[in-house]
C-alpha cells in the first residue's frame, strides 16, 4: 500500500530546518512511517508520513522492518 508520494533519495527538511534524505517506508508494531537518515548521523529515524517535511521521530531501535518504495 502506497502511503506517500516521496521518492527514494528525496531531500526533506525537519521542522528545525535540518536536511534529511528519504529512504523508504518503515513499520513499527503500531503504524507505518516514512524513514529518513540525517547527514552526519548514522542512525535512521522514523518520521511522520508526509512529504511536505518531516519531524524527528523514534530512533532506529523502534523499527522492526522497512522496505524501499
Segments (PLM) and residue ranges:
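Mixed-charge, Lys/Arg-rich low-complexity intrinsically disordered regions
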Residues: 1-8
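Tryptophan-anchored aromatic micro-motifs
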Residues: 11-14
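Short acidic/polar mixed-charge low-complexity motifs
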Residues: 16-19, 42-43
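Short beta-strand-centered aromatic/proline hotspots
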Residues: 18-28
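Repeated polar recognition positions within modular binding domains
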Residues: 30-32
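SH3/SH3-like beta-barrel fold
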Residues: 35-38
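Intrinsically disordered, low-complexity, charged/polar segments
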Residues: 40-69
